[in-house]
Amino acid sequence: MKHYVAVDIGASSGRLILGKLVNEKLQLEEIHRFKNGFTYRDGHERWEIDQLMQEIFIGLEKVKQLGISECVLGIDTWGVDYVLIGASGEKLADPISYRDKRTLNAVQNLTSEYPREYIYKKTGIQFMELNTLYQLYVEERDLLERAEKILLIPDYIGYVLTGVKVAETTNSSTTQMLNLREQLFDKDLLSHLNIDVEKFAPLTDAGTYLGEVKEDWLKMYDIPNCDVVTVATHDTASAVVGTPAEGENWAFLSSGTWSLIGMELSAPINNEVAFKENYTNEWGAYGTYRFLKNIMGLWIVQEIARMDDYKHSFAEMAEEAGNYPYFKQIINVNDARFNNPENMVDEIRLYCRETGQTVPETIGELTNCVYGSLALYYALELEKMTEITGKKIEKLYIVGGGSNVAMLNQLTAKLAGIEVFAGPSEATAIGNLVVQMINQGEIESMRAGRKIIRNSFEIGEFSCGDVRFEEIKERFTKVLEFN
């Protein structure tokens, strides 16, 4: 029996999940979990990338302690951030987080020289200051000139493990530098940044064999012999693979630090309406496209908890939220002010004052405000997606950590007026494992993998119901008018 390990690292935590296929059912075991985050060093918010590598080795040593001497391994992480590699293969600096303030006004500055419509027509990717395109636009020229290669985070981890440099397509598409039609890094865009296209590794599809873990690591750590497979390395792409969807006319919501809501399509949509609504066409596994919108997500709730010194668990916060009427206060969760404020609680209260609303005081009221606002935003985006794609959405599959928040799932079902299915919470790791198993011939296809997922995990169901959607939507429109 083959053993598979998913290295799944999000913006706030990481984990190593051991998986195997037994009687057409996936069996999972969490082997190692660790925290992730950025710290302010050398003038920027930086990821502790060396510590992440150590955590991966710790996890693999735990796998070996289970008596497993050989395994297959795949890596997925958050998107857009990168590591600059020098001529000798060395890391030139710790990677800077997408939440760093260096890209403030970068979209405006770049698009004043290079029209938005032109960039969108080429790439089909939404405009966000965190995109790799804008990070490289403001990157230190000296570092860029010294860099032989630019590797996104999961590709860098794969490179450290195997010595092989690639640019996996699902994650590379999030950079806003891939040409949709040519399916290559866009030389014209890169020349505008004075970056040679050769600084990027060869594009590689999800499901491609990468290589063996280097002998040096096997000598340094007591870890299994691992064959590394390039999975859908963008965590959302893996989460969509791990969605237990069936049939047609469904949408997905990958709910975690970020909320990513969208549809899986066979072709991109980069027309004028999609451009106006700032929708993105990220590449998916096996020739698909993730037509989606980024929404701020549970980051806001995580920051409320941090400001409260973690006195309440997330479950307790949700329970407290249920004691108050929903939609008493509504915030625009995608307002840039909530990206990385000094104090999230103060920022929410200030927003409510500025928009003529009552001010949430307690942890329960604050959490209630955020969950209600998220559900409303989801419903509004589902409405827009139907208009843009011309496809009636009948089901929403919520996966990721946010799928455990029952009240958010129920609010979403009521506001959107469609049936909601929630779970599995570890969809990203599951999608990672499914791609590995397809590569190894244990699963036939992504469709077959989703059937296995449905048979392997409990999926929650939330029915739609009557709610004052139009009234709440009108109130939200008035709130936006204050901005």
Curated annotation (Swiss-Prot):
Keywords: ATP-binding, Disulfide bond, Kinase, Nucleotide-binding, Rhamnose metabolism, Transferase. GO terms for cellular component: cytosol. CDD domains: ASKHA_NBD_FGGY_RhaB-like. Pathway: Carbohydrate degradation; L-rhamnose degradation; glycerone phosphate from L-rhamnose: step 2/3. It holds the Pfam family FGGY_N. Substrate binds at residues 79, 234-236, 294. The active site is at 235 (proton acceptor). Its EC number is 2.7.1.5. One of its GO terms (biological process) is rhamnose catabolic process. Disulfide bonds join 352-369. ATP binds at residues 11-15, 257, 302, 401. It catalyses: L-rhamnulose + ATP = L-rhamnulose 1-phosphate + ADP + H(+). GO terms for molecular function: ATP binding; glycerol kinase activity; rhamnulokinase activity. Its cofactor is Mg(2+). The keyword ATP-binding applies. Belongs to the rhamnulokinase family. PANTHER family: L-RHAMNULOKINASE, SUGAR KINASE. Involved in the catabolism of L-rhamnose (6-deoxy-L-mannose). Catalyzes the transfer of the gamma-phosphate group from ATP to the 1-hydroxyl group of L-rhamnulose to yield L-rhamnulose 1-phosphate. This is Rhamnulokinase.
